[in-house]
Amino acid sequence: MTAAILADALTQKVHQTEIDKELQALKEQAMVSGTEDSILVNKRQGAADLLGSLRLPHKRDEEWQFTDLSELKAIDFVAAGKVSLDVAAAENFYLPEAHQSRLVFINGFFTPELSNTNDLPSAITCQSWTNLAAHQREQLANYLGQKTDGNEVFSNLNTAGMTDSAVVWIPANTELKSPIHLLFLTVVDPTPIMVQPRLLVVVENNAQVTIAESYGAISTNCTDRPQQQPYFNNIVSEIYLGENAQVTHIRNQRDSGDSFHIATTAIAQGKQSRYRLIDVNLGAKLSRHNLQMTQQEEATKTEFLALTILAGRQVSDTHSTIALNHPHGATNQLHKCIVDEYAQAVFSGKVLVPQAAQLTNAQQLNRNLVLSSKARINTKPELQITADNVKCSHGATISQLEADEVFYLRSRGLNDYDARHLLIDAFAGEILDQIPLASLQGRLRQCVSCRTI
């Protein structure tokens, strides 16, 4: 072995040790709070044991090669504690469409005084895990922690510290007209805190529901801008659709501009089910969304629509995997990014179409609008196909505002600022127009106008 190879091996060994220590510190903080729930105790222990063989990601890892976690690793986070919050502060995040169908979690803890589920039929369960009856927890136990990637370190970190979860359980043959709002707020603290929200959604056969999942921060300044105290939001959401179930899922992330937001969303679809995700990502210094869909039976339809808007030195990374394991599946993924200043957007999307998935129709497109010469885009749409009777396509575009389009609008009387904003709003509008909740769509449109140019 040459001296150079030996030195490199020693460097990697030292680095591995450092990573293990950092993960161990996060694990210890995650497990500060205990639970007497036997179901959670068993799941926590399994994840904690698994963490012993895992490490935090590094840029040498292919799945993390464009996303540097050095800043997150350098901060000594402590487990978030319970805090009180004035109703007025939380009301800014409420959705009028879900006035009486809302669960609120502050720093990861269920807050019943800010929640309201009076509008929901008695057959529907919308509650925190700890407030469920024992027989309900037993019925849901097999869903909890089953669909996340078993070797993914951050989802295991969440499970190792799990003391509660938001739970939405829609029984068979139930169509819920009003949306359910799941609101997760972080109160910015002088000490860097780690928050680990959890969400479990079970929609049984022939049931329908719309769910809005929101993340935000309570602070004195515009929370999706920097100059806030850092915190770490580590989230796991698991969503199960029975046969012919339909779920519309609106997810919006507006964490503080100096925070870290890492989320795993795992979806399992039954026969002829329909799942639609509209994902809007605006906040956090560094955000990562691991999105996984598993087709459990045939003839499913899946739609992922996403909009990410970045400025400053923000980094946002979306990794999605759509596993089509049965025939007659249909997927459509449109991921759009608007990137300004020194920001960086990363997209890696895999669509897996094995031999069993005949007659699949899978479409994937990543479109990026770059507003600065210093902004960076890393994109990798990917199809892995072995089935021979399918209709699949994928692609990516990276563009700037077209000078001739700006000139045309200016020739119609708009100034340069308004012309550019009109084009940016139109680019974002393709996603925002799909949000079925008028109040949320309006707020996010205001954010787009505030964040661009």
Curated annotation (Swiss-Prot):
InterPro entries: Fe-S_cluster_assembly_SufBD, SUF_FeS_clus_asmbl_SufBD_core, SUF_FeS_clus_asmbl_SufBD_sf, SUF_FeS_clus_asmbl_SufD, SufBD_N
Coiled-coil residues: none
Pfam families hit by this protein: SUFBD_core, SufBD_N
Gene Ontology biological-process annotations: iron-sulfur cluster assembly
PANTHER family for the chain: PROTEIN ABCI7, CHLOROPLASTIC (PTHR43575:SF1)
Similarity remark: Belongs to the iron-sulfur cluster assembly SufBD family.
Designated name of the protein: Iron-sulfur cluster assembly SufBD family protein slr0076
